[in-house]
């Protein structure tokens, strides 16, 4: 290979790698070893991850549906993906932190629903933050709810950006913001959960700032 061309290729590669660092961000597409799943039947193809489950399975797991976690820690950053659900059931974006060496809830976004397990509301989006209670293993839960509905059977581009005490949630052309001091805590893993039915996801990216 011509030496000048070789040097140009190396220089271009170094530029592509260096630019994100100069801008203070690292873009990560989670690998298989950074991904885990609880419950549900998984199939993958053409860049789409499909997780299927039934109401019977949901009830057998103490009313918990399938969840996929991405183990990419960050303090400031963005979790983004596109998703599609075949039922009018809530889809939950989950962020976990660590307390005393154990995973602990940090932040949740309930799309088409609320944290209440028996709720059938599908015209709201709910944001849940958690505050530690001194001397207790339990946490104080704060819920903020707004009117919103994501259409069934359609792809929805979604992202959650955490920066200091601010969470910015974008779903298609809608943007929501939540402030809470607890959001300053480090995320050890984030993911997506649904009750039952088929949830498809693609284009999962985590950007660390």
Residue ranges and their predicted role:
Residues 1-12:
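Bacterial N-terminal signal peptides that target proteins for export
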Residues 11-20:
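Bacterial N-terminal signal peptides
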Residues 24-43:
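Extracellular carbohydrate-recognition regions
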Residues 43-65:
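Short carbohydrate-recognition loop motifs
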Residues 60-131:
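Secretory/extracellular carbohydrate-interaction modules
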Residues 81, 155-162, 167-169:
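Short tryptophan-centered beta-strand motifs in secreted/extracellular beta-sheet-rich domains
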Residues 133-157:
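Short, aromatic/His-centered strand-loop micro-motif at the edge of beta-sheets
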Residues 179-203:
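Flexible glycan-contacting loops in extracellular carbohydrate-active proteins
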């Amino acid at each position: 290979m011509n030496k000048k061309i070789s040097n140009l290729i190396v220089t271009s590669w170094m530029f592509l790698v260096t630019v994100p660092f100069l801008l203070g961000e690292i873009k990560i597409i989670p690998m298989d070893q950074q991904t885990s799943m609880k419950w549900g039947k998984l199939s993958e193809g053409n860049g789409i991850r499909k997780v299927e489950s039934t109401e019977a399975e949901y009830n057998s797991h103490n009313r918990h549906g399938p969840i996929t976690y991405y183990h990419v820690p960050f303090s400031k950053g963005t979790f983004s993906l596109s998703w599609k659900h075949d039922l009018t059931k809530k889809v939950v974006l989950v962020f976990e932190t660590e307390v005393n060496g154990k995973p602990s809830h940090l932040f949740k976004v309930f799309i088409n629903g609320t944290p209440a397990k028996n709720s059938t509301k599908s015209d709201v989006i709910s944001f849940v933050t958690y505050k530690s209670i001194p001397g207790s293993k339990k946490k104080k839960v704060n819920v903020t709810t707004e009117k919103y509905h994501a259409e069934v059977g359609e792809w929805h581009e979604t992202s959650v950006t955490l920066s200091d005490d601010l969470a910015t949630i974008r779903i298609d052309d809608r943007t929501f913001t939540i402030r809470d001091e607890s959001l300053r805590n480090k995320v050890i893993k984030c993911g997506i959960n649904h009750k039952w039915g088929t949830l498809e996801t693609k284009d999962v990216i985590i950007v660390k700032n």
